[in-house]
Design a protein with these regions (language model features):
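Conserved catalytic core of the tyrosine transesterase superfamily
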Residues: 1-256
Length: 256
């Protein structure tokens, strides 16, 4: 965080002064605030199928009449495009082109705007969702593609609660479920891409710049992190196949 960066800068100056023979104080490592970093959870194909089936059956809420239609679409968008949760829930109408499938991701972490293209099946899903969204008079003035009641985008907490509701519904009667976050959909996306490249015998480090650009990482170190997850992922998630991504996109007929 910001405080940790400030302490690092002060320590750097202190170490320089000490090296030149001046008196200076250097903060001990224990002084920096501890920041919890949850371990990424990589969903199996079976878990994803159950999760999206639960999203498809998300209950209707009269206080939020569009929510049950938003949930199945926004979580698929985050997963299949590898978005950060905030990029999905705060997506604006003017930044998604349902004719070309292009999605402009802006106002992002590290200010790295990027243009991505959705799968054709996902474009069809978004078009089907856009019909009731556009017809809902209470949301017409909202600039967001996934509007919450009142026209703003969903808060981070509300978004997380909807995801947890889907996760629990996907695993009825199971106690002590693994702790998962919306962000884990992005982790699974990256792992699936790397798994595919591994199967294709590609040089992962040569391909990393492409994944880095697509996911909007600031530098390669963030992208390299997913390679370190791969061995554990391959052991625990033996059924991870890239082609299985297609199975979570519901078929949309031409007239729907």
């Amino acid at each position: 965080g910001r405080m940790k960066n400030c302490i690092s800068a002060i320590n750097f100056l202190g170490q320089y002064l000490l090296a030149t023979g001046e008196n200076a104080y250097v903060f001990p490592d224990s002084f920096a605030p501890y920041r919890y970093h949850p371990h990424p959870y990589v969903f199996t194909d079976e878990e994803l199928s159950r999760l999206f089936a639960a999203a498809d059956s998300f209950p209707y809420c009269p206080q939020s009449p569009l929510r049950h239609k938003i949930v199945p679409v926004v979580f698929r968008l985050i997963y299949t495009c590898g978005l950060r949760p905030g990029e999905g829930r705060a997506l604006k109408k003017r930044h998604i082109n349902l004719d070309t499938g292009e999605v402009f991701i802006t106002d992002t972490k590290f200010d790295k705007d990027r243009l991505i293209v959705m799968w054709d099946d996902l474009v069809s899903v978004c078009r089907k969702y856009d019909e009731p969204r556009a017809a809902a008079t209470s949301f017409r003035k909202s600039e967001y593609f996934f509007p919450a009641p009142g026209g703003n985008c969903y808060s981070r907490n509300a978004f997380s609660q909807m995801f947890q509701q889907c996760w629990k519904a996907a695993n009825p009667g199971i106690h002590n479920l693994p702790r998962v976050r919306v962000y884990d959909l992005r982790h699974r996306f990256a792992s699936a891409v790397l798994n595919r490249w591994t199967d294709e015998k590609r040089d992962l480090y040569a391909m990393l710049p492409y994944l880095r650009a697509y996911m909007g990482h600031y530098d390669l170190s963030a992208t390299e992190h997913y390679i370190h997850l791969l061995p554990d992922n391959l052991v625990k998630s033996s059924g991870v196949f890239w082609a299985a991504m297609e199975s979570i996109i519901p078929e949309v007929k031409e007239n729907e």
